[in-house]
């Protein structure tokens, strides 16, 4: 089966929208965007027949993607991404960044799909010494740690 699709979580946010533009111009892939619109916007949608927008949460990625065998890569940008607000909305941050990301990781692992994950200077900056400065930085650093272990345990790519 030809893998001719990519998934972008957070596809209606700044990074996701710009990646969609790049993929439209440089590839032939069909693109599926999953976004809960907590920070992304429908006004960022690109009107192109190769792009499909799905309103949904990354926690439900296995239900939202009907035919994972056609997916070549998941670009995972759909996380809670506000440092200051992560103190005010800690449950939302953990749900999105830990539970939602874990669902994306498991979806990719189970279906042998390549994952591109977006790290952050909030957990990598200052030689990693800032990884516990906020709930946001903590969740991102734990995700990086989990991905390193998944790579060792399961040869996850």
Segments predicted by a language model, with ranges:
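N-terminal Rossmann-like NAD(P)+-binding domain of SDR-like oxidoreductases, especially those catalyzing
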Residues: 1-157
């Amino acid at each position: 089966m030809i893998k001719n699709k990519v998934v972008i979580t957070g596809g209606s946010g700044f990074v996701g929208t710009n990646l969609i533009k790049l993929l439209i111009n440089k590839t032939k892939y069909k693109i599926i965007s999953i976004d809960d619109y907590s920070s992304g916007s429908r006004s960022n949608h690109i009107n192109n027949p190769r792009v499909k927008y799905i309103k949904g949460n990354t926690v439900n990625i296995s239900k939202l993607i009907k035919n994972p065998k056609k997916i070549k890569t998941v670009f995972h940008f759909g996380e809670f991404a506000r440092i200051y607000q992560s103190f005010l909305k800690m449950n939302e941050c953990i749900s999105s960044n830990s539970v939602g990301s874990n669902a994306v990781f498991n979806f990719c692992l189970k279906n042998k799909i390549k994952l591109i994950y977006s790290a952050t200077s909030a957990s990598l900056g200052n030689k990693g010494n800032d990884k516990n400065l906020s709930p946001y930085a903590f969740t991102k650093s734990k995700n990086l740690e989990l991905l390193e272990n998944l790579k060792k345990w399961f040869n996850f790519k």
